[in-house]
């Protein structure tokens, strides 16, 4: 594709040192540049792509997109924001692939992964070839690929959409993070349905305030319905029990479908009961009411099931197909996943890493724990420090014993992270011990557990690594827990 043809889709730019070369690839990492590439100079948290423009040209880049003129001997397209320009041009370069897909985006603090996986399983039950993008990874049909970010950079994202189209995928569900929305990674994505799960404290290290965090999530709904196509009606699916939905309701031009348990909503759950194998409830929708039994547990999962149901109804699936799929939904790896080696106590690994999700997970555990509840919990380094004492408070309040430990400390001193957590606990709040080494902490909790107890290992879920300093080491909470249980025999 000629550079000028590609740039015809881009507003607000000027070209320093003109030319119209053929563009055969798009790259933002100078190490991956090949002859004929258009290189994007993107500012990151630790490096600035502008510093690598010369290296990109040496490797064969025939044009550069940057936020200032550069001294290189190829055309430089100067834009206000390289990352947003990259998203727009990636969409154009790969032929606007989302215009040929039914695309559902799910945003919110908690529940994105489970909701997208439920939607995926409903679509499979309906016979669709499905694509999925999120925290656990990317799926194209029956193949899975590991994830780097919850929502990939736009070059990877649009390239993935193009691959999905080429392989006959017709239906895609994806997690949309606040970072991706704020950075414009999903510019050009043509969403058919946008889903809001909930909003609780997280990522304030990046957004600064809850208001800014809320606004970033709202960008998904602000762009929904801006491109009118009577053949592809758009829908916003909102959690009516979360007051933030009222804000998003006024941000979108799309029709709204609400779901909830407390407030009167379009899609509701009534008569919710815990069962030996999961939960049962009455699913009430504009298309009728059906009795649902599911293997999932916890009120938070009722919300996830309702969100997925509303999104699937908006996508044209029948209530009967949805109900059949919900009855057979498989748990998501690392989301309330049990470690069962025949022991007489329960071990659960969960991704809960916000104050709200820790509280919800422990409240759910309380519903079936016969004796004591232990929770192993840490907080990530180089992330929102203000949530650390709040997570510790939730842990000691809802567990009998909390074990504070490391999560992914990254560049921070693990002991300082633990001190930040301990600052949230006052005398008399509850019982906790501090064990910085995560493996030791897991082994301690499992070693203390007796018949009827529950051990909840929170924070990392499906992750198979731990980041300590610059090192990424193999670490899987599930594997460590399994080994610890076996050693008790």
UniProtKB/Swiss-Prot annotation:
Chief place of localization: cytoplasm
Residue numbers carrying N6-carboxylysine: 217
InterPro entries, per the entry: Mur-like_cat_sf (IPR036565), Mur_ligase_C (IPR004101), Mur_ligase_C_dom_sf (IPR036615), Mur_ligase_cen (IPR013221), Mur_ligase_N (IPR000713), MurE/MurF_N (IPR035911), UDP-N-AcMur-Glu-dNH2Pim_ligase (IPR005761)
Protein residues bound to meso-2,6-diaminopimelate: 383, 407-410, 459, 463
Pathway: Cell wall biogenesis; peptidoglycan biosynthesis
Coiled-coil intervals, chain numbering: none
Motif annotated as Meso-diaminopimelate recognition motif, chain positions: 407-410
Cofactor field: Mg(2+)
GO biological process per UniProt: cell division; cell wall organization; peptidoglycan biosynthetic process; regulation of cell shape
GO cellular component assignments: cytoplasm
Ligand binding (ATP): 108-114
This protein's UniProt keywords: ATP-binding, Cell cycle, Cell division, Cell shape, Cell wall biogenesis/degradation, Cytoplasm, Ligase, Magnesium, Nucleotide-binding, Peptidoglycan synthesis
One Pfam match: Mur_ligase_M
Residues binding UDP-N-acetyl-alpha-D-muramoyl-L-alanyl-D-glutamate: 30, 149-151, 177, 183, 185
Intracellular or extracellular location(s): Cytoplasm
EC number: 6.3.2.13
Catalyzed chemical reaction(s): UDP-N-acetyl-alpha-D-muramoyl-L-alanyl-D-glutamate + meso-2,6-diaminopimelate + ATP = UDP-N-acetyl-alpha-D-muramoyl-L-alanyl-gamma-D-glutamyl-meso-2,6-diaminopimelate + ADP + phosphate + H(+)
Disulfide bond annotation, renumbered to this chain: none
Record PTM text: Carboxylation is probably crucial for Mg(2+) binding and, consequently, for the gamma-phosphate positioning of ATP.
Function: Catalyzes the addition of meso-diaminopimelic acid to the nucleotide precursor UDP-N-acetylmuramoyl-L-alanyl-D-glutamate (UMAG) in the biosynthesis of bacterial cell-wall peptidoglycan.
PANTHER family according to UniProt: MUR LIGASE FAMILY MEMBER, UDP-N-ACETYLMURAMOYL-L-ALANYL-D-GLUTAMATE--2,6-DIAMINOPIMELATE LIGASE MURE HOMOLOG, CHLOROPLASTIC
Entry's family note: Belongs to the MurCDEF family. MurE subfamily.
Protein name: UDP-N-acetylmuramoyl-L-alanyl-D-glutamate--2,6-diaminopimelate ligase
Organism, scientific name: Geobacillus thermodenitrificans (strain NG80-2)
